UniProtKB/Swiss-Prot annotation:
Keywords: Hydrolase, Multifunctional enzyme, Purine biosynthesis, Transferase. The keyword Hydrolase applies. The keyword Protein biosynthesis does not apply. The IMP cyclohydrolase activity resides in the N-terminal region. The lineage of its organism: Bacteria, Bacillati, Bacillota, Bacilli, Bacillales. This is Bifunctional purine biosynthesis protein PurH. GO terms for cellular component: cytosol.
Length: 511
């Protein structure tokens, strides 16, 4: 019996060549609507779906393949005598190949002016039903949903006269991944349209960006996936201009650096190691900002990741070239800067839009047996809601330093303390189990520079000991959330030493 293929695609990439190859193998081709028209325009002889179903396409094409003659031909188990007898009795013929991809729902809802009606109209019904039927019966039916698989299928047909069982199984698995992702996009879109923030079930879909050499450590396997609608201002959507492939740790660190540099509107440079900032500088231009970021911690920046929110120019590139760095990420690089930096063959250069995230972004964190979902911490300092409980208010320069430190401290692993002075960080205390421990680390790193600096804490002071350490180091201004039952103790110490202290009312834990 002659084999038959059903072809109905929205992505018409390579379909003419593929169908030509099927016809050359003696396979009869059934097609629908726009696909049939395209194939016939290219001189290929195909059978219309209505000739198989005995029923016209109706309701603007909504109903065309949902018919027993189609699904019987797909689902019949060919070595089951009852199935074969029923097919013969009903005049059905088997379908051996299904080449279908679905209505472009993802592309439709990505359009800024899409209407709800347009989105609904691009929900495919017949397509998923066909490919699921074919995939279920993959022992007898080859189902192709991705043009990338056309060549593999044709090659096996030419060599063996049929598609290998292993290939059929892989194609079937791909179908169910495809339909699962498709349905996830639809369910998430409808959930968002209803304004439902915490649905009873959460279905997420990600697309593979690349396999990684290994994970956090060489013995761990890893892969990088991107969200279908991730913000373009992200590592997932960055363009790599030069250097080795990104590693798992590179991606984590670049993400951290990018998150911090987005906090600034003025020219800024951030240096990151192990997902914590080791140096942050701002300036009148990117060269000055980098100089300050470097001077913030010239030891830790070695082997680090750099993020800048302005184009990297030649002068800055020459300074960057002087030390070993893993990654430089920026909106762009001048031609001269690229010539300088590309002389280091392993240095990864990435370009990406620098846009501050919104609260609509969701952060997913896996835990054993589950998943935590929360809004990204995008809250900025609101000067209209702050309070100053101390006798002295910050000076203009202290305010400047406090704001810089506060922007940075929210991105440091808790317990977090950041010292800033003269448009740069000078000390970072991260990830300690007690707050005063982080303060001591930051103060030690700052050394004499701590005199006259500003301190930011990601959470309140449970004891006045951090303020006492700050006073000993000559720190003159502090910004913290406040809210401890012992706030008065910290205020009293601050007043004793003439320290200005600001309460924000907002905590910025980061774990």
């Amino acid at each position: 019996m002659k084999k038959r293929a059903l072809v109905s695609v929205s992505d018409k990439t390579g379909v003419v060549e593929f169908v030509k190859g099927l016809l050359e193998q003696g396979i009869e081709v059934i097609s629908t609507g726009g696909t049939k028209k395209l194939l016939e325009e290219n001189g290929l002889q195909v059978i219309g779906i209505s000739e198989v179903t005995g029923f016209p396409e109706i309701m603007d094409g909504r109903v065309k393949t949902l018919h027993p003659n189609i699904h019987g031909g797909l689902l019949a188990v060919r070595d089951n005598e009852t199935h074969v007898a029923q097919m013969n009795e009903l005049g059905m013929e088997p379908i051996d190949f299904v080449i279908v991809n679905l209505y472009p729902f993802k592309e439709t809802i990505a359009k800024p002016d899409v209407t709800f009606a347009d989105a609904i109209e691009n929900i495919d019904i017949g397509g998923p039903t066909m490919i699921r039927s074919a995939a279920k019966n993959h022992k007898f039916v080859s189902v192709i949903v991705d043009p990338v698989d056309y060549d593999v299928v044709l090659a096996e047909l030419k060599e063996n006269g049929e598609v290998k069982e292993e290939t059929k199984r892989k194609l079937a698995a791909k179908v169910f991944r495809h339909t699962a992702a498709y349905d996830a996009l639809i369910s998430n879109y409808l959930t968002e349209q209803m304004g439902e923030e915490n649905p009873e079930t959460l279905t997420v879909t990600f697309e593979k960006k690349q396999d990684l050499r290994y994970g956090e450590n060489p013995h761990q396997k890893a892969t990088f996936y991107k969200a279908p609608f991730a913000v373009t201002s992200s590592v997932a959507y960055a363009e790599q201009l030069h250097g080795k492939e990104l590693s798992y740790n590179n991606i984590n660190d670049a993400d951290a650096a990018l998150s911090i540099v987005k906090e600034f509107t003025e020219p800024a440079v951030v240096a990151v190691k192990h997902m914590n900032p080791c140096g942050v500088g701002v300036g009148t231009d990117i060269h000055e900002a980098y100089t300050r970021a470097y001077e913030a911690d010239p030891v830790s920046i070695f082997g680090g990741i750099i993020a800048a929110n302005r184009e990297i120019d030649k002068a800055t590139a020459e300074k960057l070239h002087e030390i070993f760095l893993e990654i430089i990420i920026a909106p762009s690089f001048s031609k001269e800067a690229l010539e300088v930096l590309q002389s280091k063959k392993n240095l990864r250069l990435l370009t990406v839009n620098i846009e501050k995230a919104t609260s609509a972004s969701k952060k997913l964190t896996s835990v054993q047996g589950g998943l935590l979902v929360q809004e990204e911490d995008t809250l900025s300092l609101d000067e209209s809601t702050i309070s100053i409980p101390t006798k002295r208010e910050p000076s203009e320069q202290e305010w400047k330093d406090l704001k810089l430190a506060w922007k940075v401290v929210k991105h440091v692993k808790s317990n977090a303390i950041v010292l800033a002075k003269d448009d740069m960080t000078i000390g970072v205390g991260a990830g300690q189990m007690n707050r005063v421990g982080s303060a001591k680390i930051a103060i030690t790193q700052a050394g004499e520079k701590a005199q006259g600096s500003a301190l930011a804490s990601d959470a309140f002071f449970p004891m006045p000991d951090t303020v006492e350490e700050a006073a000993k180091a000559g720190i003159t201004a502090i910004i913290q959330p406040g809210g401890s039952i012992r706030d008065e103790d910290s205020i009293k110490v601050a007043d004793t030493y003439g320290i200005a202290m600001v309460f924000t009312g907002v905590r910025h834990f980061k774990h």
